[in-house]
Amino acid sequence: MLTALFIGLGSIGTRHLKNLTAICAQRGLALRADALRSDLARPLRPGAADLLHSQFTTLQDSAALPHYDLAFITNPTSLHAQALEEIRGLADALFIEKPIVSAEQTDVDLSTLLPAGQKAYVAAPMRWCGTMLALKNHLPGLRPYSARVICSSYLPDWRPGVDYRTVYSAHKALGGGVTIDLIHEWDYLVDLFGVPETICNIR
């Protein structure tokens, strides 16, 4: 049996829950999925509750919980550090939605939140797509002097049926805002060209 803990079941957390359930079914694996939630009274997205074994708001009874094979941290970015601290040592592997912490938390020492040897994956998949891998393989030996990346996105379209003004993506203090929430572009730029020496924000 595969055991998984979900911290945060908004749109992306629910998608990961449904995907994991489907993958386990395809592979003939039994799945126990639990959810650590901030508010049990808040309704889940359609179909999510049926896929969960248990829901709770605290880990105080963690002795009664299984040691999880996998934990998904998919709550608002500003709460990731707190979640990592709460579940420290409770899961063999971690799936952390990007980015790990918000812009206001860049002084967080991740070594205090992740035990030595902890397996963790941050969801920044664009660097692994075929086009990016081909470009990265083509770059060695070249001396690029300029790169232009354009990213167009319309926040009201991100979560159909949800008022975009109420979600963390619309609030910098919660880890939202274009500079940090659209981190995929920054991630693959750094992967391709290295860490920038200077960053300018032109408004």
Describe each model-derived feature in a short phrase.
Residues 49-112:
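Beta-loop-alpha module in the N-terminal Rossmann-like domain of NAD(P)-dependent dehydrogenases
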Residues 10-12, 76-79, 100-101, 126-129:
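Short beta->alpha connector loops
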Residues 3, 30-34, 93, 119, ...:
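Residues at the starts of beta-strands that form the adenosine-phosphate
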Residues 101-158:
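A contiguous active-site-proximal alpha/beta segment in oxidoreductase catalytic domains
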